[in-house]
Each structure stands twice: as C-alpha cells, then as structure tokens.
Amino acid sequence: HYPVYDRKGKVVASSILPYDIVDISRLSKTFGVKALYVVHPFDNQRRAIERIINFWTKGGGRFFNRYRREALKLVNLSSSLDEVIMDIERKERVKPLVIFTSAKTSKGEITFKKLKELVKKHPILILFGTGWGMVREKIPFDYQLEPIKGYPEGNEYNHLSVRSACAIILDRLFNR
C-alpha cells in the first residue's frame, strides 16, 4: 500500500481494504503461500487490519468460520518492505528474491514460466500494489514480472483489482 501512485500520479499511501486482506489471505492459503505481508507506514491502518485479523483468529469470528481463521493466520503487518525482507531472511536463512508486479510493461521482465521455476528453488517475495501502481523507483526488487495480458490479443485493458491480480498470478505460478 506504499509507495503507490494515486490517479493523478502523486506518490501516496493507499488505504487498506479489509476485504482485500481477507480474500488475498484465502488465496494464499489455497496456493500454499507461507506468509502474506501487508506493508503500510501508518499505524492507524495497521491497527485497523489487526483488529479484523484478531476478530477472525482470536475473537468471536474464530468459531464462525475456521477456514477464514486459518487463512488470516498467514497475515503479517509491517511498516516497511525492509522489515518484511529481513523477516523472510530470518525465517528462510536466505534473502528472498523480490518480484515487482505491474500492469505496465518494462524491459527485462521475467516470464511466468521462468518465475515458476524460481519459486521451486528459492524463497520469493511477490509485491502487489494498490492505487494506480507501485512506485518502481522507490522499491528495490530483483525481477519485474511480465504483466497480465487480457483477451483477445491486443486488448490493452489490464487495470485489475489487487485481489484479481493476486488470484491470476498465484494460479499461473502454482497450477498443475
């Protein structure tokens, strides 16, 4: 959620939407992702999401829907990408490869096929943005993933919600 562009091209921190967290945690659980990190520099945004996570994992919601509880246990809140990378490195004993995603094309992109091979060999941190995209120049990354392309060929429209992009990318990486 930071740093991202708003619709006017200004660098901002976008608001965290609770249903993004719930849906993406469910996707993560479905595809065997070890952890879902949500990065936001503002305490109030992290606290709001923490209350939702706690309701479903420790509060009354844990009795209502055990699947949601299990999925939301994957969520980790952080104030910076550096914290996330250090946490993964501590747990995996190796620094993760950081994968930048964007709807825009860029030279030297990694293909889904190549990333699918890397996922088997190395810890991967895939960055998904909100708003009008992540600020490429402010985020250290190892590879940029090719964008999701629509149908039919030549369809330039690809302004997807973060939930949709996550679902498509995880399916492409972990499908049989």
Explain the meaning of each model-derived region:
Residues 1-103, 167-170, 174:
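RNA substrate-binding interface of SAM-dependent RNA methyltransferases
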Residues 49-50, 112, 159:
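Conserved strand-to-helix beginnings and helix N-cap segments that scaffold or border functional pockets
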Residues 4, 44, 106, 132-133, ...:
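Surface-exposed, flexible loop/turn segments at secondary-structure boundaries
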Residues 132-176:
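Structured adenosyl-cofactor binding patch, chiefly the S-adenosyl-L-methionine
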